[in-house]
Amino acid sequence: METVNEPETGEVSKDAVIVKQEKNNEYCLQDIDDKLSESAEDDGEDDTNDEDDDEDSNPKKNTQAPLELMAEFLRAEMAREYQLAKKLCQMILIYEPENPEAKEFFTLIEEMLLMEKTQNHEQDGENSDEDSSGESKGESDEELSDESSDEGEDGS
């Protein structure tokens, strides 16, 4: 009668699994290194102008406006400094020409600037009307006071 060690035949030892995983990792790492070196060497061109080439050849490359610029834009918008907000929004659109929020804000800011401009013209018009009407009102007040003083003299 032979005794068979069932746990050893049915199970793989932990050490064997670890060794196998280490071998797989070595192969994976080596494959990755090989692929990286191949991709770096395959163009055979001078890499000094890669930054310029990447921008021209890859128009879908996402360039984002600096967060500081966006934060400054929001501060200007919240403070209702629309001239500054418009300039900052234009700068954001230079970085991100397809930014839908910046496009929307730009049109709204232009509308707000037009509204402010018309309000300023109306206020200037009212101020000039008040100045001219104030003079005529002052003249009429003087005439009334002259008449009342005349009446006082006539009545006595």
Curated annotation (Swiss-Prot):
| Superkingdom, natural source | Eukaryota
Quick one: where's region Disordered? 29-66, 116-156
Q: Where is the composition biased (Acidic residues)?
A: 39-56, 140-156
Record-linked InterPro entries: ERICH2
Name the PANTHER family for this protein.
GLUTAMATE-RICH PROTEIN 2
Its name, as the record gives it, is: Glutamate-rich protein 2
Q: Which gene encodes it?
A: ERICH2
